[in-house]
Amino acid sequence: MTNELQLHQISVSEMDNNCYLLQAGEEGLLVDAADDAPALLDMAQKAGVKITAVLTTHRHWDHVRALKEVLSETGATHYASFLDSPAIPAEVDVELREGDSIKFAGLDLPIIILRGHTPGGAALVTNIDGVINLFVGDSLFPGGLGKTTSEGDFVRLYKDVTARIFDEFPDNTIVRPGHGKSTTLGE
């Protein structure tokens, strides 16, 4: 990967959802069309990009409320984990598995599947200004893991985050969660 990506971010809804727009030239990849489609489309317009891809990190209601409208307005390709896609209220064009990549603006952006918060959330790996950025949905936050509903789910999420994130990436890797502030793996 190169450092061709620029990052734009907006927080929407009463749930304080982070929506991220990755810009490569005139193309945009939106991470989570959580809510307030007009604000998301305005963010893209102000950045001078057309949203050509949308990644839904996981199936929870607060991450998909603007999804149908954004997809309808943009014609973007919709990506989501194959484990969560059956419960996402919009057609998923590409179902992602562990080790897959999203091909966006000539870049291959790796995907990590994180099980536990939902059956299988999709995290996106990028390089922005020479620093690895992980867009993790609600699987990892500053200070700990995302919410789980059973001991088995907690263990799955802990193992996935440990093996697929902490064991693989340096401490200066930026974690960009679905809500709240970003952090680094070393913090």
Label every PLM stretch briefly:
Residues 2-47, 123-137:
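Conserved beta-strand hairpin/beta-sheet module of binuclear metal-dependent hydrolase folds
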Residues 10-11, 93, 113-115:
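Short Gly/Pro-enriched turn/cap motifs at secondary-structure boundaries
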Residues 16, 28, 35-110, 132:
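Active-site HxH/HxHxD metal-binding segment of metal-dependent hydrolases
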Residues 20-23, 101-129:
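Core dinuclear metal-dependent hydrolase active-site scaffold
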Residues 22, 32, 58, 70, ...:
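Divalent metal-coordination and catalytic microenvironments
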Residues 33-35, 59, 84, 107, ...:
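Active-site metal-binding loops of divalent metal-dependent hydrolases
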Residues 118-187:
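Metallo-beta-lactamase
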